[in-house]
Amino acid sequence: MRCLPVFVILLLLIASTPSVDALQKTKDDMPLASFHDNVKRILQTLSNKRSCCPTILSCCFV
């Protein structure tokens, strides 16, 4: 009999939690593929700057 109130409280807590589908997306949510695309673009830009002028070192660090 003492376990019954605990069981009822647990059922109420489980029923009141929102499901994953109920959570709304915010503007800060970004797909992981987009993040990987940005990383690839940044790395390509950096590699292009490094190979722009291998004889003059000062322009490669810009």
From Swiss-Prot:
Signal peptide stretch: 1-22
Keyword annotations from UniProtKB, A to Z: Cleavage on pair of basic residues, Disulfide bond, Secreted, Signal, Toxin
Disulfide partners: none
One GO cellular component term noted in the UniProt record for this chain: extracellular region
Superkingdom classification of source: Eukaryota
Intracellular or extracellular location(s): Secreted
Keyword presence, Transmembrane helix: no
InterPro entries: T-conotoxin
Primary location: secreted
PTM (free text): Contains 2 disulfide bonds that can be either 'C1-C3, C2-C4' or 'C1-C4, C2-C3', since these disulfide connectivities have been observed for conotoxins with cysteine framework V (for examples, see AC P0DQQ7 and AC P81755).
Residues cleaved off as propeptide: 23-48
Tissue: Expressed by the venom duct.
UniProt keyword tRNA-binding, yes or no: no
Family that this chain belongs to: Belongs to the conotoxin T superfamily.
Domain notes from UniProt: The cysteine framework is V (CC-CC).
Protein's name in the database: Conotoxin Pn-B0151
Biological classification of the source: Eukaryota, Metazoa, Spiralia, Lophotrochozoa, Mollusca
